[in-house]
Amino acid sequence: MPISLEYLGPAQAPASVGDFYFLRHGKTDLNEKEVFVQGEKHWGVQGAGTNIGLNETGKRQAVLAGNVLRKLPISSVVCSPLLRAIQTAVIANIGCLCFEIDDDLKERDFGKHEGGYGPLKMFEENYPDTENTELFSMRVAKALAHAETENTLFVSHGGVLRVVAALLGVELTKEHTDNGRVLHFRRGCPQWTVEIHQSPVILISGPSRGIGKAIAENLIAHGYRMSLGARRVKDLESAFGPQSEWLHYARFDAEDNDTMAAWVTAAVEKFGRIDGLINNAGCGEPVNLEKDIDYKQFHRQWHINCVAPLRMTELCLPYLCETGSGRVVNINSMSGQRVLNPFVGYNMTKHALGGLTKTTQHVGWDRGVRAIDICPGFVATEMSAWTDLISSNDMIQPNDIANLVREAIERPNRAYVPRSEVMCMKESIH
């Protein structure tokens, strides 16, 4: 429900305000509390007089917001002095050197009602023992003057956000007012607009263990929203905990194309977009040219290492093109660049995977899609346990690959690297 003119009183936005960003703090326990009193819904009351920190959900929301904000041209950060706002700004790790606290960005003061529950009218109008709405609106308008410097970021509260929007004549939806949302207010002609910025959505196949698990953990820690596909969803729950608004699980069988289509459909239904695909699932079974070849085993390896990445790329490509900066990361191998053994199945399929990467790059380039082969040598996982050429301590570690994957996702379109060869032992350069 929009704030009324009566609520605002004489408050007006400064005339010289430029485009700016707004981040509502992450959730606290009070944000999640509701009760019914005589059939009327009451919400948890936390205003200027309630100085509590974020709960675990709120901390995660701050991490997600940070992923977005670090890519935006933030010129300065102006923050409410309340703990929940400061925690949000710190956890988001925005990386802006200009940081300021402004008391005028505090939430409205709800007096003796702080920490309890209140009806809707407490938040919508002047209510006994609460801060006068006109005075509240006037101090918010005063704080808004910081946006005379373009691309200022305000880190504040829901009530402050609603006043800001009302001062600028912008209508907010529930999605705009959710905790942890990054909003971009733009001065248009003739009116202001507001846009939501959310962290990218990345799909990873085979993330239950090894390299895939390290990649998923790394991206989650850096504020990406994730859709994870594995044969057994319970393995994902064991590895990453329950699903949430930013974490999605799906059944993925690299030998069953139907599971791939269902996964992509479910991910889009949940998040509304796909920004990146990481084809990680692979098969390293030793199909040996020096022995009788098991062609059933070879065809299985071909399907897992080549057909499944192709199908996933085909399914995701339309959504990746929509973003203007879609990413496809194929976890390849140095075995896709050179040959050191008779394992013809693995060597062939990894060379073929490189062909998929190049074709994806060719097809998607003009729509902003970039594809990369990440080609490690021996990685300290179960797949490399057979070799005695190098000790596990001297092998590439899974998180080394995870860091390279994240760098590939975040690298700009204008300076893309299509292949990364990762070595842990002396080899000739091809």
UniProtKB/Swiss-Prot annotation:
Keywords: Oxidoreductase, Plasmid
Domain of life: Bacteria
Electron transport keyword on record: no
GO molecular-function terms, A-Z: oxidoreductase activity
Annotated protein name in UniProt: Agropine synthesis reductase
Major enzyme class: oxidoreductase
UniProt xrefs under Gene3D superfamilies: NAD(P)-binding Rossmann-like Domain, Phosphoglycerate mutase-like
Function: Reduces deoxy-fructosyl-glutamine to mannopine.
Classification via PROSITE patterns: ADH_SHORT
Pathway the protein acts in: Opine metabolism; mannopine biosynthesis
Species name: Rhizobium rhizogenes
Name of the encoding gene: mas1
EC number: 1.-.-.-
UniProt cross-references to PANTHER family, sorted A to Z: EG:BACR7A4.14 PROTEIN-RELATED (PTHR43975:SF2), ZGC:101858 (PTHR43975)
Species lineage: Bacteria, Pseudomonadati, Pseudomonadota, Alphaproteobacteria, Hyphomicrobiales
Binding site for substrate: 333
